[in-house]
UniProtKB/Swiss-Prot annotation:
Record's keyword terms, sorted: Keratin, Repeat
Segments of this protein annotated with the region 13 X 2 AA repeats of CG: 4-82
Additional note from the record: Human have a similar number of genes as other primates despite the relative hairlessness of humans.
Function: In the hair cortex, hair keratin intermediate filaments are embedded in an interfilamentous matrix, consisting of hair keratin-associated proteins (KRTAP), which are essential for the formation of a rigid and resistant hair shaft through their extensive disulfide bond cross-linking with abundant cysteine residues of hair keratins. The matrix proteins include the high-sulfur and high-glycine-tyrosine keratins.
Keyword Repeat: yes
Protein name (Swiss-Prot/TrEMBL): Small cysteine and glycine repeat-containing protein 3
S-S bonds: none
Domain of life: Eukaryota
Gene Ontology CC annotations of this record: intermediate filament
Family membership: Belongs to the KRTAP type 28 family.
Amino acid sequence: MGCCGCGSCGGCGGGCGGCGGGCGGGCGGGCGGVCGSCTTCRCYRVGCCSSCCPCCRGCCGGCCSTPVICCCRRTCRSCGCGCRKGCCQQKCCCQKQCCC
């Protein structure tokens, strides 16, 4: 649950049992701890990384891509203006780059 995938192959299925198809590299820095953080896509929530880059899935629906830092907090469930579940710079925003 919430394991970090290879990115290029779309993440690991079956509870992080491994990536089939032989994708190399992928995450690069990878996720620390139990996918508590992605050094590449900067998604800060435990169990948020199903595939490291370019998007973090399962974390309030937030999408992270450098250089824009998008953080997902459970307190930000809605931005109220079209952006379903996006948090940018710890504030709810409506920019497309902050939403998945």
